[in-house]
Amino acid sequence: MTSMTLKNPLAGLLAAICLAGCGALPDKPARAALYDFGPGLAAPAAPAASATGSAPRALPMIALAEVDANSRLDGTQLLYRLGYADANELRPYGQSRWSQPPAQLLRQRLREGLSAGHTVLGPEESATIARTEGRLPDSLRVTLEEFSQYFESPGRSVGLVRVSATLTRNQPGGDRVLAQRTFTARQPAPTADGPGGVKALAAASDAVVAELVAWVDQAR
């Protein structure tokens, strides 16, 4: 009887210790929210047929290289700058990330924009054209130079995107530069946080893409 009396309080004490230990375990770290530029632009229209009703007119080809970026923009971190404190320092959000590096997201948008009026080729497709037809299409090379949420004050920020672009044409003597330009876009963020920065950077990227596509058409 005495042993039974001692055993029950001991079992209760052990159970209490276990419950206390479980309650003291750290919570699982919150998973970072992943973002991209949204579902994309409207699908490009089909090539228009000729006046005689024959097959649709073939779109001009353009080779789109991979978008380059400096080492600061190689990762998937969502970056911001405090312009009112130290604009030279890039800071990452802790719980907000891009689903892919910004250069890849930008290239997807650029390909969508160009495909409305061009047959867009990647590096491998361009190489195939060169082997089979003995020619290379004009080539567009883009470098992403700035991609951050820029805080002008604690409560006001913009999405800041800057790219440099070079359009070249392959010739027997080597590539000839047709045009070269830098594009910059700033779009206001609806909120002074990571999700607001995502919306602003997506809008600024779309603005840069629209301007770049129009420039390509004019330069050719």
What are these regions (language model features)?
Residues 2-12:
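Bacterial N-terminal signal peptides that target proteins for export
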Residues 18-21:
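C-terminal motif of bacterial Sec signal peptides marking the signal peptidase cleavage site
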Residues 23-104, 219-220:
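A structural "domain/chain start" motif
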Residues 88-97, 171-213:
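Short secondary-structure boundary motifs at beta->alpha junctions and helix caps
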